[in-house]
């Protein structure tokens, strides 16, 4: 429990320190995420992983990019 507390405190300091130097919150948060990670890449990776778990070969499949025009099936 103490470890979780200190991790939370350190995360707050990590975000708050640049803010005290005049940074904007949005810029600070964007700085925590690598530039090459996009929502499309994450979705494609998750869909690709799901397909490979269902028995398909991941080496031959390209990640599927979800577009705004695609319909998302609602779960039960």
UniProtKB/Swiss-Prot annotation:
Domain of life according to the entry: Eukaryota
Post-translational modifications: O-glycosylated. The glycosylation seems to enhance the affinity to the neurotensin receptors.
Localization, UniProt: Secreted
Region (Disordered): 51-76
Glycosylation-annotated residues: 60
GO MF terms held by the record: toxin activity
UniProtKB keywords: Cleavage on pair of basic residues, G-protein coupled receptor impairing toxin, Glycoprotein, Neurotoxin, Pharmaceutical, Pyrrolidone carboxylic acid, Secreted, Signal, Toxin
Residue numbers covered by the propeptide annotation in the UniProt entry: 23-50, 67-76
Residue positions, PTM Pyrrolidone carboxylic acid: 51
Main location: secreted
Any one cellular-component term (Gene Ontology): extracellular region
Record-stated family: Belongs to the conotoxin C superfamily.
Any further remark recorded for this protein: The mature peptide does not contain cysteine residue.
General function of this protein: Acts as an agonist of neurotensin receptors. It binds to human neurotensin type 1 receptor (NTSR1), rat neurotensin types 1 and 2 receptors (NTSR1/NTSR2) and mouse neurotensin type 3 receptor (SORT1).
Name recorded for this polypeptide: Contulakin-G
Lineage, broadest ranks: Eukaryota, Metazoa, Spiralia, Lophotrochozoa, Mollusca
